[in-house]
């Protein structure tokens, strides 16, 4: 009987992942593409229901991923070198979990084989977001959903 091989995310560090492995850690929840507000008093970061103009509100996928930085210059491109900064990501985020040495959740597509599980389990904000094109920036505080961290 062959020995069981641990999945790549449990046996490699973030720096050891190839591009395909790195990209596959994304669970497709779209939460990193929600607009965030920082509290000036305690520097806490709060997520809003306001999505980047490029985010598909149903699929939670970027509509122009390859060129996103051209139309959204402040789009954050996650890299393994930023792992110590991942605390602002949701606690369910594959990048954050792996950076913390934790396993992926059962609903993650790399575990269950179903890319829609993130929506069925209501981890994503699919169907519950608004496009930044439809909400004035001054009103974003009215759409806070949770505190990062």
Curated annotation (Swiss-Prot):
InterPro entries in alphabetical order: Puta_zinc/iron-chelating_dom (IPR005358), UCP006173 (IPR008228)
Family annotation (Pfam families): CxxCxxCC
Family: Belongs to the UPF0260 family.
Protein name: UPF0260 protein Psyr_1567
Provenance organism: Pseudomonas syringae pv. syringae (strain B728a)
């Amino acid at each position: 009987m062959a020995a069981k091989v641990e999945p790549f995310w449990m046996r490699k560090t973030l720096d050891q992942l190839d591009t395909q492995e790195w990209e596959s850690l994304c669970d497709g929840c779209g939460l990193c593409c929600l607009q965030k507000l920082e509290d000036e008093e305690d520097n806490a970061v709060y997520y809003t229901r306001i999505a980047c103009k490029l985010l598909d509100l149903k699929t939670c996928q970027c509509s122009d991923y390859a060129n996103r930085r051209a139309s959204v210059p402040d789009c954050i491109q996650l890299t393994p070198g930023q792992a110590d900064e991942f605390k602002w990501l949701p606690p369910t985020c594959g990048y954050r979990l792996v950076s913390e040495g934790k396993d992926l959740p059962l609903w993650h597509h790399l575990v269950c084989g179903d890319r829609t599980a993130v929506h069925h389990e209501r981890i994503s904000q699919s169907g519950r977001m608004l496009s930044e094109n439809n909400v004035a920036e001054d009103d974003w505080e009215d759409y806070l959903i949770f505190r990062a961290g």
